[in-house]
Regions:
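A contiguous strand-loop segment
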Residues: 19-119, 139-295
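Second-shell loop/turn segments in exported
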Residues: 111-113, 121-130
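Glycine-rich, aromatic-lined ligand/substrate-binding cores of catalytic
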Residues: 221-372, 376
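Sec-dependent N-terminal signal peptides
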Residues: 4-14
C-alpha cells in the first residue's frame, strides 16, 4: 500500500481535526460576468446545519441579544441588540454581503475563553448589521474588541457586490477581552483562497483604502517577545500562526490546488505545499488568473481532489481508496502503522462537509436579485447547487426541516437524503459515481441556464414592486430545492436497485431490463477492477 510518511517536525498547533473548511474568492474583474464570488465548505464531523434564516427586524431600545456558541450551542452571554437588523439567509444578507470562514488556530496561549463572541456569532451578527463588506469588518471588530472573542484564530471571507476582503483575527489571551486583527482587500482582478492556515503576511499599513488593522496588531507581539522588527516588516502569519507541516500539506495545498487550476506558474510553490522544505517560498495571498472564472468554474473547484497533481489520491499503487478507488480517505488524517506515522492528503472536497455554497454578488442588479447563494447540504462533489436568492425570507422546506437534526433522519430533509446517496456511493465510487454525476450535472446546468430567464422575470416584477420580485424569488428558490430533493430520492432508489449486492443490473435509459419471461435480466458480476486486483496480488506475494 502506498504510504505518506510524516514530516519529522510535525507539530500540533491548531485544532484542525474539528474545524477544517475551505474558502475560495474571486474579485469582480476576475469573473466572467463581473460578479464578486466566494465559496464556503463547512467541514466538521457530525455537523448538521440547516439553511439558517434571520428575518429583518426593528428592536426596541434596551433589547439584548443572547449569544450562543455556533459550534457547541453553549450560552456565552448577551450583548445589546442593534436597532435595525437585516434579512439573512444562510451566509448572505439582503444587501448581498457574504461572510464565510476557516479556522487556523494559531498560538494556543492567545485564546480567550472568557470572551462573549465566537467566530460563528461574529459572522451572523455581522451579516445582520452590515450593508457593505467594510461595514461588516467594522461591526465584527468593534464587537470583538468590546465583548471579547473566544475562538481560535480565524480567517474570515467578507464580500459585497463591489469588494472582496479577508480578515484574520486572534484573541490576546485568557481574560484579555481583546483581539489582534488585520483585513486586506483582494484586488478586483485577483483570486484568493484560505483553508485553515493563516495567509496574511506583510501588509501595507499606509494603504488605508485596502488595509485595515487593530492598533495593537504589532505592539501585542512585541509585548510578548514574539517580534522585535520594524512595523513595516511585521508578518501576521509568521508571528501568530506560523505554518507547520500540517498547515502546509493539509491546508495550504488546497489553496495551491485552486490557484493551480488558473495559473501555470504554480509549479514553483509545490515544495511549499508539500511541507517538507522549511525554506520553501510561500505562496502569495492572491494571484491574477490567466482567464476569468465563471460560476461553473467555482463549483468545479469546490469538487477538487487534487486530480492530475502531485497530491492526487489515485497514484499508482495507492489502494487507500478501496476496491472502487474513491478519492476520499478515512480520518483522522494522520495514523500509525507498526510504530510508523503516516498521513492522508486533505483535498478541498471532503466527506465531512455539512454544507457548501458559492455566493454570487452583482452590483448592476437590484440587490434583491443580484445576490445568489448557490447552496448544497453535503460534500460539493456529491451534490448539485441550488439557487437561494438573498431576499429569500422563508428557507425551502428541505433545507429547514422541522424534526430533522444530526441524529434524526427525515426523508424530507436535503442533508439526510444527500448524505444517504453519498454514503452509498463512497465505497463503490468508480462504479456508482458516474450515475450520480449525470444527475448532479444535469441539475447544475439547468439552474445556471435558467438563471437569466428567472432574473428577467424577477426584474419585470421588481419594476412593479420589490415585494412582487421577492415573492417570485422565494417561490423559485423553493421550487429548485424541492426539485433537487425529488431527483435525489429517485437517484437513491436507482442506485440501490442497480448495484444491489455488489452486482450490476442492466438498464436502458434508466429502465431496468427484464428477461423474456418477465423476471429481472441477468445481473453482471464485475469483480475487482484490474488496478486493484493487481495491487492486491502484489501484497499476497
Amino acid at each position: 500500500m502506498y504510504k505518506q510518511i510524516f514530516f519529522s517536525v510535525l507539530m500540533a498547533v491548531s485544532p484542525l481535526g474539528a474545524d477544517c473548511c475551505t474558502n475560495l474568492i474571486v474579485g469582480k474583474d476576475a469573473s466572467t460576468d463581473g460578479s464578486v464570488m466566494c465559496t464556503y465548505s463547512a467541514d466538521d464531523y457530525g455537523m448538521f446545519q440547516n439553511l439558517c434564516h434571520y428575518p429583518a427586524a426593528r428592536h426596541p431600545k434596551g433589547t439584548m441579544r443572547q449569544v450562543y456558541d455556533w459550534d457547541t450551542n453553549a450560552y456565552n452571554g448577551q450583548i445589546p441588540e442593534s436597532p435595525v437588523t437585516y434579512n439573512v439567509i444562510g451566509n448572505i444578507n439582503e444587501y448581498q454581503v457574504t461572510i464565510a470562514e476557516t479556522t487556523f488556530g494559531g498560538r494556543e496561549e492567545m485564546v480567550d475563553s472568557t470572551g462573549t463572541l465566537d467566530y460563528g456569532s461574529l459572522i451572523y451578527i455581522g451579516l445582520q448589521r452590515s450593508r457593505t463588506a467594510r461595514e461588516a469588518i467594522e461591526v465584527m471588530t468593534t464587537l470583538a474588541e468590546r465583548y471579547g472573542y473566544n475562538s481560535y484564530g480565524e480567517t474570515f471571507t467578507i464580500c459585497d457586490p463591489d469588494e472582496a476582503w479577508i480578515m484574520e483575527m486572534m484573541g490576546c489571551g485568557p481574560g484579555s477581552k481583546s483581539v489582534v486583527w488585520v483585513a486586506v482587500r483582494i484586488p478586483d482582478n485577483a483570486i484568493c483562497a484560505h483553508a485553515n492556515q493563516s495567509r496574511i503576511r506583510k501588509f501595507d499599513r499606509k494603504d488605508k483604502d485596502n488595509v485595515m488593522y487593530s492598533k495593537n496588531v504589532v505592539s501585542f507581539a512585541r509585548s510578548k517577545g514574539w517580534y522585535d522588527g520594524t512595523d513595516a516588516d511585521f508578518d501576521f502569519c509568521s508571528t501568530y500562526a506560523a505554518p507547520d507541516f500540517g498547515g502546509r500539506r493539509w491546508c495550504e495545498a488546497r489553496v495551491w490546488s485552486f490557484f493551480n487550476r488558473f495559473a501555470k506558474s504554480m509549479d514553483k510553490y509545490v515544495p511549499y505545499a508539500e511541507g517538507h522544505s522549511p525554506n520553501a517560498e510561500p505562496m502569495p495571498l492572491w494571484i491574477v488568473p490567466e482567464r476569468k472564472l465563471s460560476l461553473a468554474d467555482l463549483e468545479a473547484a469546490m469538487r477538487d481532489h487534487y486530480e492530475g497533481t502531485p497530491f492526487a489520491l489515485d497514484k499508482p499503487g495507492d489502494i487507500g481508496g478501496g476496491i472502487w478507488q474513491m478519492p476520499y480517505r478515512p480520518t483522522p488524517l494522520e495514523y500509525e502503522v507498526d510504530g510508523q506515522k503516516c498521513f492522508n492528503e486533505r483535498p478541498i472536497s471532503t466527506q465531512q462537509a455539512g454544507f457548501v455554497f458559492v455566493s454570487q454578488m452583482r452590483s448592476w442588479l437590484p440587490r434583491q436579485i443580484g445576490g445568489v447563494l448557490w447552496f448544497a447540504n453535503d460534500d460539493a462533489n456529491m451534490v448539485p447547487f441550488t439557487p437561494i436568492y438573498c431576499c429569500v425570507n422563508k428557507p425551502p422546506h428541505c433545507y429547514d426541516t422541522p424534526g430533522a437534526d444530526a441524529v434524526t433522519f427525515s426523508p424530507d430533509n436535503a442533508f439526510w437524503i444527500q448524505n444517504w446517496v453519498s454514503n452509498m456511493v463512497y465505497p463503490r465510487y468508480s462504479q456508482m459515481f458516474p450515475a450520480l454525476r449525470a444527475v448532479r450535472d444535469s441539475l447544475d446546468s439547468a439552474y445556471i441556464a435558467f438563471q437569466p430567464e428567472a432574473e428577467a422575470r424577477a426584474s419585470e416584477l421588481y419594476a412593479q414592486s420589490a415585494d412582487k420580485a421577492v415573492a417570485y424569488l422565494n417561490g423559485y428558490s423553493a421550487k429548485c430545492a424541492e426539485e433537487m430533493l425529488g431527483r435525489w430520492k429517485k437517484l437513491a432508489v436507482f442506485l440501490i436497485v442497480k448495484y444491489n449486492d455488489m452486482t450490476v443490473k442492466p438498464d436502458s435509459c434508466g429502465r431496468f431490463l427484464r428477461s423474456p419471461h418477465g423476471l429481472g435480466a441477468t445481473v453482471e458480476r464485475p469483480g475487482y477492477p484490474a488496478a486493484y486486483a493487481r495491487e492486491m496480488e502484489k501484497l499476497k506475494k
